[in-house]
Design a protein with these regions (language model features):
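Positively charged, small/polar-rich N-terminal and surface patches that mediate targeting and assembly
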Residues: 1-114
Length: 114
């Protein structure tokens, strides 16, 4: 099994979730986060009437799903179709091995099933 984590702009989350569902990924977790990548950070004000300054972080979201090894290429292709824009700061996708899963309802551990 593999953990696929797509770090995308907040406006892309629904598209990524729809793409995952369309290819048969059975679930996903969405996490809001801040980070410093190569993308330009927005100009913001700390409060009304204060001068503009560059934000320290960009706001992004991680869409995380666990899939069988055989689905990884399909999932990556589906994400790329809806997210790849050619512009800096669009995000990244990481793939990690998942050695074991523990179901917290039953306490059952498994190396090959969700």
């Amino acid at each position: 099994m593999k953990k696929v984590e797509a770090i995308v702009k907040p406006g892309m989350v629904r598209d990524v979730l729809s793409a995952l569902k369309a290819v048969g990924a059975s679930g996903a977790t969405v996490v809001s986060e801040r980070g410093q990548g190569r993308g330009a950070r927005p100009l913001i004000r700390d409060s009304k009437g204060t001068p503009l300054h560059t934000a320290e972080y960009n706001t992004m979201n991680s869409v995380i799903t666990i899939v069988n090894d055989s689905m990884v290429d399909t999932v990556l292709t589906a994400i790329a179709k809806v997210v790849v824009s050619g512009s800096k700061g669009s995000g990244k996708v990481f793939v990690f091995p998942v050695d074991e899963v523990m179901d917290l309802e039953t306490g059952r551990r498994s190396s090959n099933s969700m």
